[in-house]
Amino acid sequence: MQQHPMPDSLPGAAFWEALGWTPEPAQLGQLKALQDLLRSWNSRVNLTRLVEGDDYWINQVFDSLWPLQTELRSPHQSRLAIDVGTGGGFPGLAVAIAMPGARMTLLDSVGRKTAAVQAMVNDLGLSDRVSVRTDRIESAGHDRTLRGGFDLAMARAVAAAPVVAEYLVPLLKPDGNALLYRGQWGDTDLRQLKRALVPLNAQLSSSQHCQLPAERGVRHLIRLQPVSPCPRQFPRAVGVPSRQPLGG
């Protein structure tokens, strides 16, 4: 993708062209309102430092949405999606705004963050199709209401790829996709991930990369798909996936 410097205020047409998706006026208003809400909540809860200018529009909005260019071609299609480790609400809130057909679950283990995100969901008028849950993913992955129920499961800046795979794969429908948002990515990362996918009964379906606008760095997206049902023992008990990563 070509690089497009950001203006001081709202993004221009070149920004959205680079993203491959242009918001409706109401969606742009929601994205701006989300920025204002983040500013307000950051004074009470440390959600994110990426709130102003390029930090928000590129490192939050653009970085949340570019991996979903395929899905953004049919934004009103009914989908069930989950954002694991949502933190301050990304990528989940940006995805919910951009894809009106999606029903989103935003999951995080830190109660003060989920309380802030729930308040933002309410203020943005998204509570009819966005739910916020406070839980550890190792526990949530065994919940009958979540396990095997999602078309899309995504995680950004959560843990190493083999760990994230163990978190996300059990949540997928048989034809679902896990989206691993990655920064640096190389051959060693790929080998470790492929080894981790074997016991999960999953496979790597695609990988792609993107140069963020304004020379904000390169990002990678790794998509995973189930091959057969994920064994019931995954995800393992709280803390085990990160201490003893699959494929290590």
From Swiss-Prot:
Main location: cytoplasm
Keywords: Cytoplasm, Methyltransferase, rRNA processing, S-adenosyl-L-methionine, Transferase
Claim: Transferase is one of the keywords in the record: yes
Enzyme class at the top of the EC tree: transferase
EC number: 2.1.1.-
Pfam families: GidB
Binding site for S-adenosyl-L-methionine: G85, F90, I137, E138, R156
Domain of life the protein comes from: Bacteria
One Gene Ontology term of the molecular function aspect: rRNA (guanine-N7-)-methyltransferase activity
InterPro entries reported for this sequence: rRNA_ssu_MeTfrase_G, SAM-dependent_MTases_sf
Subcellular localization, as worded in the UniProt entry: Cytoplasm
A single GO cellular-component term on record: cytosol
Family statement: Belongs to the methyltransferase superfamily. RNA methyltransferase RsmG family.
NCBIfam families associated with the record: rsmG_gidB
Stated role: Specifically methylates the N7 position of a guanine in 16S rRNA.
HAMAP family reported for this sequence: 16SrRNA_methyltr_G
Protein name: Ribosomal RNA small subunit methyltransferase G
Record organism: Parasynechococcus marenigrum (strain WH8102)
